[in-house]
Amino acid sequence: MPVITLPDGSKREFAHAVSTLDVAADIGPGLAKACIAGRVNGELKDACDLIETDAELSIITAKDEEGVEILRHSCAHLLGHAIKQMWPETKMAIGPVIDNGFYYDIDLEHKLTQDDIEALEKRMLQLAKTNYDVVKRVVSWQEARDTFAARGEEYKIAILDENISKDATPALYHHEEYTDMCRGPHVPNMRFCQHFKLMSIAGAYWRGNSENKMLQRIYGTAWADKKALSTHLTRLEEAAKRDHRKIGKQLDLYHMQEEAPGMVFWHNDGWSIFLELERFIRRKLNQYTYQEVKGPLMMDRVLWERSGHWDKYSEAMFTTSSENREYAIKPMNCPGHVQIFNQGLKSYRDLPLRMAEFGCCHRNEPSGSLHGLMRVRGFTQDDAHIFCTDDQVQEEVSACIQMVYDTYSTFGFENIVVKLSTRPEKRIGDDAMWDRAEEALKQALRANNIEFTLLPGEGAFYGPKIEFTLHDCLDRAWQCGTVQLDYALPSRLGATYVAEDNSRQTPVMIHRAILGSLERFLGILIEEYAGRFPTWLAPMQVVVMNITDKQADYVQEIVKFFKEQGIRASFDLRNEKIGFKIREHTLRRVPYLLVVGDQEMENKEVAVRTRDGIDLGKMRLEDFATKIHQQISLRSLKLLEE
């Protein structure tokens, strides 16, 4: 007679084993109709799974984030159902949930076209509209293997052979004549899977290994209702307009080419923004009392072996050899910073020691994962490492948190999601050390009035971590900042300091990044601002245009004056109509467009308009310079009169 405890604390007693769907029906027919799955004693279960003992139960519906993830997963199975109807010879590989959607990797000789994708989507909708039940069967490993062997599903067999114990009892989900295998849970009926769209096709190697066969990957998105789907598709359209690769080309910021995959060729205007970002962070480093250092680009393999990176990270490292020695180009800055710390005897009075670097790092990312500035092989990390005592951890982490929020708010990012990853099952150190470390991070977050989500067991083996994820104007999430405690690397690389009692102690190391990769953050900014950078970041802040040749000398004097004032300015003296020139520089997203005619020249004035077409009227040159200087020094996100 299980007693079911609901989230509001109420209890319901049943005379026999019940499913989540049974409990929902006992509460009311509306909830039964909306029920997708259940969280039983903290674990997600299918709506049909029986609950035989007392349990705590949350009923999952499409209003829950988990419910939407489940229906997305079921849409992947629906896609498989449709594919097998249209191309029965298809071999199905994997179909997981991803952010905002799902994909399925398939082995099919026929190369899918956009017309095929549209036909597949239509077939999926036809199937879903029949509102068929999804039937779950838990079977033996052998029965599952026999089922897929009879269907010629070699990839499912490989998953069973290589990833699932023979003692396991896999779950098979039957969509009418189509059968798939999954941990689940899945929707009980396809009425939940009515609002989806297939988005694109790509290539993907089986198991992500380039030595394996290339499969076709079909991406889709799915939502709980028509409105949510429509909102998402509208956001995607806006994201396409803001694509940093497209805007980067339009504004001549950078380019990438086949001969240097994942490496950025910065053009003048793009490099101007990059340097401005660097200057901004450098000011923050001075404000928060950091040393700035510079380590070598590559170091001997021996050092990477001692740090532990060679065992865990060597496949992602670029290497080279010289004079019978093997070197690795650094994928991160931390081992180099420990080497700098180790030079000379350090006392407890020297701690905390905050060491920062704009480190040029390289990682051998798979070519298929490269994506403009967002995923590169060569990047600059605004990395820092703080060497401190246990007692200093909380205060130092608190300062890091303040620096993160101080920095992000300057760029207009106010919606920050914070997660704290705690001790994993396999870890160094005793529970007392982890208790102190985790509590220090929690207290630092609370002291700054930061709400955070705990991720139990998600920390690194060498210490807990705080992650900062910012949300942009399209509500996309970008994980940028991190604060990571490290109790292992200083010890591995022999870092010590002389404590107050003259004993040798190992410092705690705090890994800290604010922007992360400057390249990636610049890509985020391009899309956030749609190329319309605030004045302080804009590569060209002012362009001055003449109406006739008579004003040419005066225009050049104005630009010289601006440059002497530290304002990035240029002139346009082309023999073109002023309307044409205004339009061209508006498309270049230059914040301020200054026009000079005879009257302006005579009165030592400029006619000012913004890139948004707002006419600010005539101003004395010195007055305009004062206003724009104030805007730049405040790092205002708005233009004058906005």
Swiss-Prot record:
Listed transmembrane segments: none
Domain of life of the native organism: Bacteria
GO cellular component: cytosol
Ranges where the TGS domain occurs: 1-61
EC number: 6.1.1.3
Record SMART domains: tRNA_SAD
Cofactor remark from the record: Binds 1 zinc ion per subunit.
Keyword vocabulary terms for this entry: Aminoacyl-tRNA synthetase, ATP-binding, Cytoplasm, Ligase, Metal-binding, Nucleotide-binding, Protein biosynthesis, RNA-binding, tRNA-binding, Zinc
CDD domains: TGS_ThrRS, ThrRS_anticodon, ThrRS_core
Compartments, as annotated in UniProt: Cytoplasm
HAMAP family attached to this UniProt entry: Thr_tRNA_synth (MF_00184)
Assembly and interaction partners: Homodimer.
Protein role: Catalyzes the attachment of threonine to tRNA(Thr) in a two-step reaction: L-threonine is first activated by ATP to form Thr-AMP and then transferred to the acceptor end of tRNA(Thr). Also edits incorrectly charged L-seryl-tRNA(Thr).
Descriptive protein name: Threonine--tRNA ligase
UniProt source species: Shewanella putrefaciens (strain CN-32 / ATCC BAA-453)
Lineage: Bacteria, Pseudomonadati, Pseudomonadota, Gammaproteobacteria, Alteromonadales
Gene: thrS
